[in-house]
């Protein structure tokens, strides 16, 4: 099947996250992505550890398959290089604070005057307008402001650090990609270009839809970690086995809960986790702690009760299930070493053949293609 974005040109002015992951997804679906970077050092991710022979692994994971142009956006030559590209580009992605692109002469109105069909995607923490539009922040701030971080629970009954970049990726990358694709369809149907205002803090709200229903609409006070999906019930929480490994018990439905209780031989009088949830959870914890995870894993798998032993990222990468589905079969070349590429949620039919090996362009590698001066050697 032909890659659906094979004729789409994307100009990428973003750094770190979430923009680079969004443009990576577009690239994987066939779009040509030109990444613009500072001439001196490139974007910040090029400087992050770990590295392979000086090449940042994190940068390569998020930026392979893109062209690199090192360009000082404040220089006199910048618009000479950019204007021909702006005239034919389909999508522009940026994640500066509001007003920065305007000062560079690259704001939406200026670009739209050059190309009325441009789909201009701005990704920020709090959006282009509002009292906090200019506020600095990172993922931790955005999930904190959205209310979802308050729903986690740690050993001291306080919110814990999130395990992943929920706002950056879930509130920034994914909404950006979805809305860019919607805008492309709308334009194809006779519409014009548009300015997409993606706010990571707003995109995070959907991750706790149930808290919106219970807390905002129903007006209930949701205690920290006290809801069904945040550890408030014995049948949906993490427990520790005798070897210290964690077991994820997700037996929400009654049939799964009873199957799990049978595995650990929980007495019938304790199986009603609604009546005395603390006592029930304590006994479940005691029983799971009596044996190592290797003992429980096959029993829980055989019972098919939504209970699994937590894996590390390295264990997950060699899991037979993911191997069978080819999740990690795409490869990257990082300074001559072939490594697994980051799995992305794009159907295989829409991507290039898995046998191709991706590579991140060196800083300014594509400057000659677009008439830009080569960057000075670092």
What are the residue ranges of the model-derived segments?
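N-terminal helix-loop segment corresponding to the beta1-alpha1 unit
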Residues: 1-189, 223, 332, 347, ...
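Short, surface-exposed loop/helix-turn segments at secondary-structure junctions
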Residues: 46-50, 215-226, 319-333
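Short Gly/Pro-enriched turn/cap motifs at secondary-structure boundaries
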Residues: 59, 225-231, 237-238, 336-343, ...
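Short acidic-hydrophobic surface loop/beta-edge motif
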Residues: 60-62, 237-242, 328-334
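Oxidoreductase and adenylate-handling cofactor-binding alpha/beta cores
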Residues: 146, 172-193, 206, 210-218, ...
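A short glycine-threonine-serine/GTX helix/turn-capping micro-motif
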Residues: 160-171, 193-195, 226-227, 234-236, ...
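Aromatic-enriched alpha-helical interface/lid elements that frame and gate functional surfaces
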Residues: 230, 234-303, 307, 314
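A glycine-rich dinucleotide-binding beta-alpha-beta segment and adjacent secondary-structure elements
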Residues: 302-355
């Amino acid at each position: 099947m032909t890659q659906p974005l094979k004729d789409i040109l994307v100009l990428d002015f973003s750094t770190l996250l979430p923009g680079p992951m969004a443009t990576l997804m577009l690239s994987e679906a066939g779009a040509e992505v030109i990444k613009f970077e500072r001439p001196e050092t490139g974007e910040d991710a090029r400087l992050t550890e770990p590295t392979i022979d000086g090449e940042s692994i994190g940068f390569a994971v998020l930026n392979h398959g893109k062209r690199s142009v090192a360009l000082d956006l404040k220089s006199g030559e910048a618009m000479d290089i950019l204007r021909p590209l702006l005239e034919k580009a389909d999508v522009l992605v940026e994640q500066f604070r509001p007003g920065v692109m305007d000062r560079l002469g690259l704001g939406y109105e200026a670009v739209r005057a050059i190309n009325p069909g441009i789909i201009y995607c701005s990704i920020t923490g709090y959006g282009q307008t509002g009292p906090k539009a200019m506020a600095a922040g990172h993922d931790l701030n955005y999930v904190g402001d959205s209310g979802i971080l308050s729903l986690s629970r740690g050993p001291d009954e306080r919110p814990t650090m999130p395990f992943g970049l929920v706002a950056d990726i879930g509130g920034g990358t994914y909404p950006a990609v979805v809305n860019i694709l919607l805008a492309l369809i709308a334009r194809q149907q006779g519409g014009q270009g548009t300015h997409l205002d993606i706010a990571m803090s707003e995109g995070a709200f959907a991750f706790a839809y149930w808290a919106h229903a219970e807390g905002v609409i129903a007006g209930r006070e949701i205690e920290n970690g006290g809801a069904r999906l945040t550890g408030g019930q014995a049948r949906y929480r993490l427990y520790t086995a005798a070897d210290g490994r964690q077991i994820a018990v997700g037996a929400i439905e009654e049939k799964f809960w009873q199957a799990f209780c049978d595995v650990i031989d929980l007495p019938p009088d304790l199986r009603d986790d609604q009546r005395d949830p603390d006592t029930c959870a304590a006994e479940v914890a005691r029983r799971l702690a009596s044996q190592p995870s290797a003992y429980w894993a096959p029993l829980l798998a055989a019972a098919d009760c939504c209970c699994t032993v937590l894996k590390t990222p390295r264990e997950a990468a060699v899991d037979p299930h993911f191997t069978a589905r080819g999740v990690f079969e795409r490869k990257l070349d990082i300074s001559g070493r072939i490594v697994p590429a980051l799995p992305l949620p794009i159907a295989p039919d829409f991507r290039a053949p898995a046998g191709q090996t991706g590579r991140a362009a060196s800083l300014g590698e594509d400057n000659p293609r677009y008439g830009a001066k080569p960057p000075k050697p670092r």
